[in-house]
């Protein structure tokens, strides 16, 4: 099964920078993946380079819940 990977460290970096444009692009791709029947994997990359997959999103409802949580920490422009 195909999947789209979201690296959570990258999401956190964009949150700190208030980079809505980059976050929007990631979530557009994730939404397309879910609509196309793919799974969205949330992955954290450790300092030593190993990856830890801690959640999989397969529905638009779950993706929107995660997206809302992410944007909660982004300041309005």
Predicted regions and their residues:
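Short, mixed-charge low-complexity intrinsically disordered segments
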Residues: 35-77
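Intrinsically disordered, low-complexity boundary segments flanking structured domains
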Residues: 3-4, 26-30, 59
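A short, charged, amphipathic alpha-helix used as a generic interaction element across diverse proteins
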Residues: 21-41
């Amino acid at each position: 099964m195909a999947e789209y990977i979201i690296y959570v460290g990258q999401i956190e970096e964009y949150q700190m920078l208030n980079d809505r444009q980059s976050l929007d692009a990631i979530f557009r791709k994730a939404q397309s993946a879910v609509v196309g029947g793919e799974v969205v994997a949330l992955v954290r990359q450790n300092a030593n380079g190993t990856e830890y997959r801690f959640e999989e999103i397969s529905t638009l409802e779950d993706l929107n819940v995660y997206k809302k949580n992410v944007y909660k920490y982004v300041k309005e422009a």
